[in-house]
Design a protein with these regions (language model features):
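Non-ligating segments of multi-cofactor redox enzymes
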Residues: 1-263
Length: 264
């Protein structure tokens, strides 16, 4: 068997193994499946612990809390305090795993992977690289500053990212809950419509582009990206074997030039 065939075989095995890990991670993150038929959410002790990926707290099956939602809940409370626990958790995960979380453990990342497998014309995002900096603005503004600074009369701020932007919330929370709970269904308004539109846009873009939400919008991915340079799990280039052919950069669907910035 020549080298090319060996590489293709290894690539297929890794792809299957990765898909299995993603499916298992999504199941563990949303283990309380019967709640989908009850119209309520799990509120046990597990919700005191954050999960590493983007997964809505309000998902009926969610086994833990979303770190982004939990962080906003703390900084947006009437008694503002910096969330050391959640920040420490994110730093720990970032140092240990980096964006391995995005590629293998995040349910919303897995959904985008599945959507991109739908047959049809696929578009490259290589010329849209500047958009990747948008997720850092989302992290700073929608997750940190706005919930802390824009407050109501009693000093409480809205979880701006979760409330106005996050498509995972409407997919995992609003849609399944309203489907079986008439009270929730009757309370849906313009905000639900707005977020549903965002979800539809993300779904369509995910079919055309590879992981657009991860590349351009996700604040959790932005945080983990900041930890990449110190992460224990990362990519190293063997400079003695690298011939600078550029094949790795062409093959990378996340538009990373591994020879220049393997852990960007």
């Amino acid at each position: 068997m020549d080298k090319k065939k060996k590489k293709k075989k290894a690539s297929r095995l890794i792809s299957r193994f990765r898909g299995l890990i993603q499916a298992c991670a999504a199941l563990v993150t949303n283990i309380h499946l019967p709640n989908f038929f009850k119209g309520g959410i799990y509120q046990g002790k597990g919700k005191a612990v954050c999960v590493p990926g983007l997964n809505c707290y309000s998902c009926p099956a969610a086994s833990g809390a979303c770190p982004i939602g939990a962080f906003q809940a703390v900084v947006g409370s009437s008694k503002f305090s910096f969330s050391y626990y959640i920040t420490g958790f994110l730093i720990l995960i970032g140092v240990l795993l980096g964006r391995f979380v995005c590629g293998f453990l995040c349910p919303f990342g897995w959904l985008q992977d599945l959507l991109h497998k739908i047959p049809g014309k696929k578009l490259s995002t290589k010329k849209l690289k500047p958009l990747r900096y948008l997720k850092y603005a989302v992290l700073l503004l929608a997750v940190v500053l706005l919930p802390a600074l824009v407050v109501n009369d009693v000093g409480m701020g809205d979880p701006f990212f979760c409330k106005y932007i996050c498509p995972q919330g409407v997919l995992e929370g609003a849609i399944p809950l309203s489907a079986v709970n008439e009270g929730i269904r009757s309370a849906l308004g313009s905000l639900f419509t707005q977020k549903l539109i965002i979800l539809v846009v993300v779904v369509v873009l995910s079919i055309l582009f590879y992981r657009p939400f991860c590349k351009w919008i996700c604040p959790l991915g932005a945080f983990y990206a900041l930890m990449n340079k110190v992460s224990l799990l990362g990519i190293k280039v063997d400079e003695h074997k690298c011939v600078s052919c550029g094949n790795c950069a062409k093959a990378c669907k996340m538009d990373v030039d591994i020879t220049k910035s393997p852990n960007h």
